Structure formats: C-alpha cells, structure tokens
Amino acid sequence: MAVTKTIVVLPGDHVGQEITEEAIKVLNAIQECRPDKVNFKFDHHLIGGAAIDATGVPLPDEALEASKKADAVLLGAVGGPKWGTGAVRPEQGLLKIRKELQLYANLRPCNFASDSLLDLSPLKPEIARGTDFVVVRELVGGIYFGERKEDEGDGVAWDSEKYSVPEVQRITRMAAFMALQHNPPLPIWSLDKANVLASSRLWRKTVEETIKNEFPQLTVQHQLIDSAAMILVKNPTHLNGIIITNNMFGDIISDEASVIPGSLGLLPSASLASLPDKNTAFGLYEPCHGSAPDLPKGKVNPVATILSAAMMLKLSLDLFEEGEIIEQAVKKVLDSGIRTADLKGTNSTTEVGDAVAKAVRELLA
C-alpha cells in the first residue's frame, strides 16, 4: 500500500514558482511509476517577498505550522530588489524557518552532474575534474543569530559570533555521519579562523575532540578559512570529502564552491533537523541559487531544484533508490544536450523539466 508523504512547497519569489513546478513534475513522474509505493501530497504556502506583499510578514504562521507537520519542505527562492533592505525583508522568512524548524545542518554538494559540463567551469578542466565534496554548514548559530547593534545615528554598529560546545558537537556528528556513508570513509576538513577568533578556537578544539572520542576511524584536518578559499580555486580536489564550517564561513565558501561546476543552476542543498540515519530526517530542500529577478520567464535552470528534490527523497522520504534515479535522469538529459542558456543550451525551463520527467519514467519502466 502506498505511503502518503506530505511536502510543503514554498515557491517564494520570481523564478521560485517555475523551478518548484519542474521539481513537482519530476516527483509526479516518480509517483506515476511507483503508485503502490508512494503518494505525494503537495501543500503550497507563501514565503519571502510574495508573503510580504500578501500578508505583511515574510513567513506567515500558517506556512510555518504546515511546515512543522510535513515530511519535508521544498523551497524555491526568496528576495529581490523590490523589497530592498528595509525593516521587513524576504530573507528574514528564510532565517526564521531555519531557526523555528531547528534546521541546524546545511548540506551543499559540489560536484559535476555530468563530466560533459567540465568545459563550462571557470577553472581549467584538468583542475576542476574530479571535484567532489559536500559543505556541511552550521545553520542556526554564529554571527547571523548573535547579538547585534544597528547604527542608531551614532555611527557604530556591531555583530557578535557565539558558539557553544553542544552546537559544534552536533554539526560535527552530522559531518561524521556523511563521511561514514562511504567505504572507505571520506576525510573531513574543518574550516575556521582559529588564529584570530575565540569562537574558532572553541570550534577547532570541539571538532578535534568529538572526532577523536566518537569517530576514531575518521580523519579530520583543520584549515584556516582564507587558506581554504585559495585552495578551492587552485586545487579544489585537495578538499574532496566532507567540509565542516560555521554559519558565515559556510555561507561564503559554499557560494565560492558553487561556481566550480559552471552554473549555480546545477547545485542542490538540504537543511536538516536531525541525522538522516533512517533516511527520514526532517529537512528543507532548495537550490543554491537566488530568485534571479532579472531573468525572463522560461530561462531559469531547474536542475538544482530537481536535484534538491532527489536529496529530499534520499534523506527525508526514505526513497533512496528513487532519489538516485532522478540523479541518473538529470545526467542523461544533460549528456543529451538538453540544457538551459546558463549551460550554453537553447532549451526552456519546462523543456528541461519535461525531459528529466521523461527520463525518470524510462529508467523506472
């Protein structure tokens, strides 16, 4: 008998509507081919600028409550110049949902969905080839959630970075879990600024002790964040494995990493509230790119969102095989030359989504 999985869909702003529609199209193809296994129930709600326009707040209570009751959340993108940098901003909805749902771990893979895309990387193919790591970013602590003071006319503003041992232990265990999913286990790289920051010294000490005491079979190496940023351009495969870092450093380094495969439109992400040890962790899934307000309709690449849906199947919905099928379908479509303009292709958003859904049906036939 089919199990019903409830997915809250938060399209958000601008291209968010288009990309979530394509991901749903691919998920529906899974459902069509596995009618006895799964039934997806999609529950749409507002977030970001769209929510501000309709309700005055970036995350309405009903969207948050629905998300808490769901099996997983699929997010499009939030933000845009229309809403500026005023007191109420679209991005506040994203920060709030992360905090309220305790989505403490952000996972952002960086690899090539297909080797046929190597020539699109800003790095030389011989440098970029083989890049394969996951950034595990602590998502609900650090400077983004610390105490702060705005400039109130006195010309002074400040933000504070604070981490506790339990917070660092929790994200370290997530990185260790991800490393142990491979045989042999992947190496772990911990990025910090321990030569300057007290919070980074606590971070480094806690990561080191947690791995040593709880995961002695794993290796962890510490790298200063500025040095890691240089390595990422000069020799990205040196950092292959699992990269663990704090909220702000993770935000920056994962964006730097995201250009290596040639387009932000290729990279998925997952934000988890617990270890996915039974493939049923609650999570929010979204592409790494933003809302692209200047992009004409039909031009956005839906692959990142489709691959985010694949991560959702594998980590939250206990449909690991089906998640891998979506990844295979994406590779098949990209290799066939069906691509959006960011990948030097001529296909529309819906054409790429249609092609992936068709490939899924063929692979599951």
Curated annotation (Swiss-Prot):
Q: Which domain of life is it from?
A: Eukaryota
Which reaction equation describes what this protein catalyses? (2R,3S)-3-isopropylmalate + NAD(+) = 4-methyl-2-oxopentanoate + CO2 + NADH
Q: Does the keyword Cell membrane apply?
A: no
- Its pathway? Amino-acid biosynthesis; L-leucine biosynthesis; L-leucine from 3-methyl-2-oxobutanoate: step 3/4
Ordered alphabetically, the record's keywords are: Amino-acid biosynthesis, Branched-chain amino acid biosynthesis, Cytoplasm, Leucine biosynthesis, Magnesium, Manganese, Metal-binding, NAD, Oxidoreductase
InterPro entries with a match to the protein in the record? IsoCit/isopropylmalate_DH_CS, IsoPropMal-DH-like_dom, Isopropylmalate_DH
Site note Important for catalysis applies to 144, 193
The Gene Ontology biological process annotation of the record reads: glyoxylate cycle; L-leucine biosynthetic process
> Where located?
Cytoplasm
Q: Which residues bind NAD(+)?
A: 80-91, 290-301
Cellular component annotations (GO), alphabetically ordered:
cytosol
Q: Which residues bind Mg(2+)?
A: 226, 251, 255
Q: Membrane-crossing residues?
A: none
Q: In the UniProt record, does the keyword Glycosyltransferase occur? A: no
Q: What is its EC number?
A: 1.1.1.85
Amino-acid positions noted as binding substrate in the UniProt annotation, renumbered to this chain: 98, 108, 137, 226
Please list the cofactors this protein needs.
Mg(2+); Mn(2+)
Q: A single GO molecular function, which one?
A: NAD binding
Details of cofactor binding: Binds 1 Mg(2+) or Mn(2+) ion per subunit.
Q: Which NCBIfam families match?
A: leuB
Relate the protein's function as given in its record. Catalyzes the oxidation of 3-carboxy-2-hydroxy-4-methylpentanoate (3-isopropylmalate) to 3-carboxy-4-methyl-2-oxopentanoate. The product decarboxylates to 4-methyl-2 oxopentanoate.
Oligomer status and interactors: Homodimer.
Family affiliation: Belongs to the isocitrate and isopropylmalate dehydrogenases family.
Supply the name of the protein. 3-isopropylmalate dehydrogenase
